[in-house]
UniProtKB/Swiss-Prot annotation:
It is a peripheral membrane protein. One of its GO terms (biological process) is lignin catabolic process. Residues 11-87 form the GST N-terminal domain. GO terms for cellular component: plasma membrane. Belongs to the GST superfamily. GO terms for molecular function: hydrolase activity. Able to degrade various dimeric lignin compounds. Catalyzes the unique and reductive cleavage of arylglycerol-beta-aryl ether. Keywords: Cell inner membrane, Cell membrane, Hydrolase, Lignin degradation, Membrane. This is Beta-etherase. It is found in: Cell inner membrane. The keyword Hydrolase applies. The lineage of its organism: Bacteria, Pseudomonadati, Pseudomonadota, Alphaproteobacteria, Sphingomonadales. Residues 244-281 are annotated as: Disordered. It comes from the Bacteria.
Length: 281
């Protein structure tokens, strides 16, 4: 049982003190969802092994009354298993599979393109002692030896291409307050973590001012006394479109179902064209 209702969390921070890791972000939300206070152990990309006493080279890591738990997904499952009397993060194995699908979809749709658009900002905002490591590791492991500067260059042409790909996500949130239904759950926290990561490094906004995602994002950032409102975060909204850029989202003119079509409420839903009388010979 968590001593004094507090669980220790090893963070991954930028120079501003803002959390950068989406995995740490969703663990922060998971702990708050369960009603725990969080004892943050600060730190950046380097020195994780030393901070965790040789237990891990990656974060998040939590310590619950002496019990060490690694990996954000494992941590969430651990919290539900150990504290079933508190609000649940998951509701059964089927929901877990759907969450994993959404998580993978967001990473391929948004995180991948945005990573390349903000990779130099990512480096510049890191702790000074981390920057050599960030440059070397990202250039060698993720960018095939390309320089950060070369990869980020031209992002003004690429940023407008991402918002239209998020339309399926907008359609879901147009039908429900939270991904978890009436209340948020780990699906919301995992998805919010993508945008929290983006806000930590995005010196140029990735979304337009009028993006319908704003409502869900604002409510999500405000959860748990403004957990997502760190002064080191950058604005997500304010992307300026140029002539020829694609429309950032579909502007709904009426109620829509999950597939973007009008809800079927009976024969009156389908408006058939008037029948034209055939001319007599």
């Amino acid at each position: 049982m968590a001593r004094n209702n507090t669980i220790t969390l090893y963070d991954l921070q930028l120079e501003s003190g803002c959390t950068i890791s989406p995995y740490v972000w969703r663990t922060k939300y998971a702990l708050k969802h369960k009603g725990f206070d969080i004892d943050i152990v600060p730190g950046g990309f380097t020195g994780i092994l030393e901070r965790t006493g040789g237990r891990s080279e990656r974060v998040p890591v939590i310590v619950d009354d002496g019990e060490w738990v690694l990996d954000s997904w494992v941590i969430a499952e651990y919290l539900d298993e150990k504290y079933p009397d508190r609000p649940m993060l998951f509701e059964g194995p089927t929901q877990k599979n759907l969450m994993k699908f959404l998580d993978n979809w967001l990473w391929s749709t948004a995180v991948g393109p945005w990573f390349r658009c903000y990779i130099l900002d990512y480096h510049d905002l890191s702790l000074p002692q981390d920057r050599d490591y960030v440059r070397w590791s990202r250039e060698q492991w993720f960018l095939g030896g390309q320089r950060l500067e070369d990869v980020q260059a031209g992002r003004e042409d690429r940023l407008p291409l991402v918002p239209p790909t998020l339309e399926p996500f907008r359609r879901i949130l147009a039908e429900t307050k939270w991904l978890g239904g009436d209340q948020p759950n780990f699906a919301d926290y995992s998805a919010l973590a993508v945008f929290l990561w983006t806000a930590s490094v995005a010196r140029t906004p990735p979304l337009t001012e009028d993006d319908p995602l704003r409502d869900w994002l604002d409510r999500g950032f405000d959860l748990f006394d403004g957990l997502g409102r760190h002064p080191g975060m950058n604005p997500l909204f304010g992307l300026k479109l140029r002539e020829g850029d694609p429309e950032p989202f579909v502007r709904q003119t009426g109620p829509a179902g999950a597939g973007g079509q009008a809800l079927n409420k009976g024969p009156q839903t389908t408006k058939m064209p008037p029948r034209v009388a055939e001319k007599a010979d």
